[in-house]
Curated annotation (Swiss-Prot):
The gene is COY1. InterPro entries: CASP_C. GO terms for cellular component: Golgi membrane. This is Protein CASP. Residues 636-679 are lumenal. Its main location: Golgi. It comes from Saccharomyces cerevisiae (strain ATCC 204508 / S288c). The chain crosses the membrane at residues 615-635. The keyword Transmembrane helix applies. GO terms for biological process: Golgi vesicle docking; Golgi vesicle transport; intra-Golgi vesicle-mediated transport.
Length: 679
């Protein structure tokens, strides 16, 4: 729905001012009900009077017919006032609520918008929470990629370790196989050597066996030769083993150098891999920090953009307000241009106030007479205003009487409440004394014995004498009894005390409300008294215009009321101001000459009322017409006479004409001077 509809409805309901309208309607409804009751009572009394009038004799009916007619007229006036008041209330309400739109769709749409606003607030809070959470977990993708990289690198390292381990195992097995093969070759060589030696020894042994038969002489030499040959064979074996071991050592040294070179190369590659892994870890950490910083930067950018948008909206609203203020200023300037004659109207109003409150009756009569010459409808407007003021005065009188009755009723109710409060205070004091009696009883007995003794004594005492009313209500024993039932009596006493306190608080609240209503009624009565004095001043002001025209038909009640208000009005006037005005008028009149005083008295007589003013006006018009006709007649006659006579007669006629005009001008000048002096 468009905002213009809301603004239009807001303006209309603001102009209607529903709270004040409800307050006024409450007061108006109360007044209508009062008038209804008064009209019912008056109609009942009128019905009884008519019944009595019907039962009278014809002669008595003629005597009392004016009275019954006046009562009917009064009842008709009351009914017309009641209908006018009801119509006024109805028209006021209609004027305020005629253009007011139906608030149901507006309230429904506003409720829907409020629900949407609440949902949007919750969603905004959720979005902000998720954005904060997302900013905290901005390195999720980097962590995920790092995890994948770590998994891949761990798989690669595991594969590398497996390959290295397999290579190591293969190399160890190859080395062992090679060693075993070399050992086997060495052993085979040794075996072949041993076999050759064995064969050589067997050949030698066979030779020796063949030669044994040749003689035992050569036995020692042969033994020596055998020993030498065995030693030579052993030496050859040792040398062969030494050669093989040296070759094996040389091969092992060469293999050791190759393995040390491979080990150095492998250690350098591992260091490079560790450095690379550390650099990758640092790089991943920097990437995660970068992601967090970029997320925080993005969040800050969004918050700053949101703040910028809010500031732009505030700036636009301020610009719109400034534009509205400028338009209002332009309208005010136009109004000021339209009200450029304010000072003039203010001067006229001050003059009217002076006429109303601070000028003599003669001066005000002169001003009003001059205004009557310019505007003949002024008197009719004053008469209508007088009627309206009289109607409002009657309404205020009825209101004041009703409020006096209400004030008397409130006084009576306040007195009754005071009496009730006094009785309640006495009852409360009595209850407190009874409570003190209950609390002061000495608890020397146990519960069972005290209860039994209390019950027996209470029964005995009831046979002998009566209990007090308070004791009979709350169950307090007399002075001679013990408080055995204290544990059961105290809750009852406390409950009754609470009831008395709540009742006392309610009565105090009612008393405060009565005092506040009494103060409000006193303020309203003082306001009504001020309004009545102002209305009396206006009536005095309006009666100064038609004192000589309007007939005096006032009842004794109205005379008494007006005498009361006249006394208040006379007391409110400042005596020094009246004395100063009278002295000023006396001083002005004293400075005048006898001829001016004669002219002023003549002007006062002429301008005294409407009849004298009209007579003087017709007299002036007739005199001027007569002079004009005589001059025309003399001019026409002069043409038929001789030249000398015509000249003489024309001179005489002109002198007569000048004399008549001079007299009229003197009278007008005298009236003007008197009017200026009075001003």
């Amino acid at each position: 729905m468009d905002t213009s509809v809301y603004s239009h409805a807001l303006d209309i309901w603001a102009k209607a001012d529903l709270t004040n309208l409800q307050r006024e309607l409450d007061a108006d409804v109360i007044e209508i009900k009062d008038k209804e009751t008064l009209s019912l009572n008056s109609r009942k009394s009128l019905a009884t009077e008519t019944k009595k009038f019907k039962k009278l004799e014809p002669e008595e009916k003629l005597n009392n017919v004016n009275k019954i007619i006046k009562q009917y007229q009064r009842e008709i006036d009351n009914l017309t006032q009641r209908s006018k008041f009801s119509e006024k209330v109805l028209f006021d309400v209609y004027e305020k609520l005629s253009e007011a739109p139906d608030p149901q769709p507006l309230l429904q749409s506003s409720l829907e918008k409020l629900g949407k606003i609440d949902d949007s607030k919750e969603l905004k809070e959720k979005i902000s929470y998720l954005e904060d959470k997302l900013a905290k977990y901005a390195d999720y993708e980097t962590l995920k990629s790092r995890l994948l990289d770590l998994e891949q690198s761990s798989a690669k390292t595991l594969a590398k370790r497996l390959t290295a381990k397999t290579q190591e195992i293969n190399s160890t097995w190859e080395e062992k196989g090679r060693n075993w093969k070399e050992r086997e070759a060495d052993l085979l060589k040794q075996l072949t050597n041993v076999q050759e030696q064995n064969k050589a020894l067997e050949a030698k042994i066979s030779k020796n066996i063949d030669i044994e038969g040749n003689g035992n002489e050569d036995g020692d030499q042969e033994n020596n030769q055998k020993e030498v040959s065995t030693r030579i064979a052993e030496y050859n074996l040792v040398t062969q083993e030494l050669e093989t071991t040296q070759a094996r050592i040389y091969q092992l040294e060469k293999r050791n150098e190759e393995l040390s070179g491979a080990l150095a190369k492998a250690t350098s590659e591992a260091e490079k891999e560790t450095e690379l892994h550390a650099k990758e870890l640092k790089l991943n950490q920097l990437e995660s920090e970068n992601a967090l910083l970029s997320a925080s930067y993005e969040q800050e950018r969004k918050s700053t953009s949101h703040a910028i948008n809010e500031l732009k909206e505030q700036l636009n609203s301020v610009v719109a307000e400034s534009e509205s203020y400028k338009s209002e200023l332009e309208t005010v300037r136009r109004k000021l241009n339209n009200y450029s004659d304010y000072n003039k109207i203010k001067e006229e109003l001050s003059a009217l106030k002076k006429i109303e409150f601070g000028v003599n009756e003669d001066d005000s009569d002169n001003d009003i007479r001059s205004e009557d010459k310019n505007d003949n409808t002024f008197e009719s407007s004053l008469l209508s205003a007088n009627k309206k003021l009289q109607a409002t005065l009657a309404e205020y009188r009825s209101k004041s009487t009703a409020q006096e009755e209400e004030r008397n009723e409130l006084k009576k109710s306040v007195d009754q409440l005071k009496q009730q409060i006094a009785t309640l205070k006495e009852a409360n004091e009595k209850l407190e004394t009874d409570l003190e009696k209950v609390e002061n009883v000495s608890p020397h007995f146990n519960e069972t014995a005290s209860m039994m003794s209390g019950v027996t004594r209470q029964m005995n005492n009831r046979t002998s004498h009566k209990m007090s009313p308070t004791s009979s209500i709350i169950g307090i024993p007399e002075d001679g009894e013990l408080s055995g039932n204290q544990s059961t009596i105290l809750p009852i006493v406390t409950k009754q005390r609470d009831r008395f306190r709540s009742r006392n608080m309610d009565l105090e609240k009612q008393l405060r409300q009565g005092n506040s209503e009494k103060g409000k009624l006193k303020l309203e009565i003082s306001k009504l008294k001020g309004d009545n004095t102002k209305l009396y001043e206006r009536i005095r002001y309006l009666q100064s215009y038609n004192n000589n025209n309007a007939p005096v038909n006032q009842s004794t009640e109205r005379i008494d009321v007006e005498s009361q208000y006249s006394r208040v009005y006379d007391e409110s006037l400042h005596p020094m101001a009246n004395f100063r005005q009278n002295e000023l008028n006396h001083y002005k009149n004293k400075k005048l000459s006898a001829l001016e005083k004669l002219f002023s008295s003549f002007a006062k007589v002429i301008l005294q009322n409407k009849m004298t003013r009209m007579v003087f006006l017709f007299y002036c018009i007739g005199l001027h017409g007569l002079v004009f006709m005589m001059s025309m007649y003399v001019i026409n006659i002069s043409g038929y006479m001789t030249p000398e006579v015509g000249i003489v007669q024309s001179a005489k006629s002109s002198s007569n004409l000048n004399g008549g005009l001079g007299g009229a001008e003197k009278v007008a000048a005298g009236v003007g001077s008197v009017h200026g002096i009075n001003r």
